[in-house]
Amino acid sequence: LARRQRQMCIRDRSTPVERKAIQDSALAAGARKVQLIEEPIAAAIGAGLPISEATGSMVVDIGGGTTEIAVMSLGGVVYSKSLRVAGDALDQSIIAYMRKKMNLMIGDSTAEKIKKEIGTAIPSSNNTFLMKGRDIRSGTPKEIELTEKDACEALMPILNQILGGIKEALENTPPELSADLIDMGLVLTGGGALLKNIDKLISQDTGLPVTIA
């Protein structure tokens, strides 16, 4: 780390022990000084949100393992919530759907490919994907053509959990900051924000404008 000051992201609501462990590790690796920044604030800074101003800003960071939801103002986090559902859970939801609805076993890589090719929060095209897997009943290889509607149905259990977390954050946001969000909306970050039409789904569900950073 070349004996320089380092800024490191930490999980929101990290314990003092966890924070000290991260600082000690960075110092042991050669950093001269370590500044810890909570993940939601780092995501908001990266998205260009005016978090230091006396207005409310909201960021939803959909990563691989967790979804971090935070409302910020005056440089601090006013409300935050961490959900243990995100990109990886979307893949697992596809696997579970294929097994239950199609009697087909697929692996993680196939599920991720389905998510990227035809995954969507709101079906909006006739795109299809020819999926290969193993038939649960016969044990033989099998091909099935999936539609965007199929993919959306597979993803909705996880998307609904994310929507629930966003609604809870909005319900716990102070009224004066809620008024700011009506105009500013919320910002989506992270790999999960790349899911087709997820911004439209969240906007329809919350009534807020949604921007993908």
Model-derived segments and spans:
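Conserved Rossmann-like nucleotide-cofactor binding loop
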Residues: 65
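ABC ATPase A-loop
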Residues: 1
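Nucleotide/phosphate-binding catalytic cleft detector across ATP-hydrolyzing
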Residues: 4-7, 11-62, 70-186, 193-213
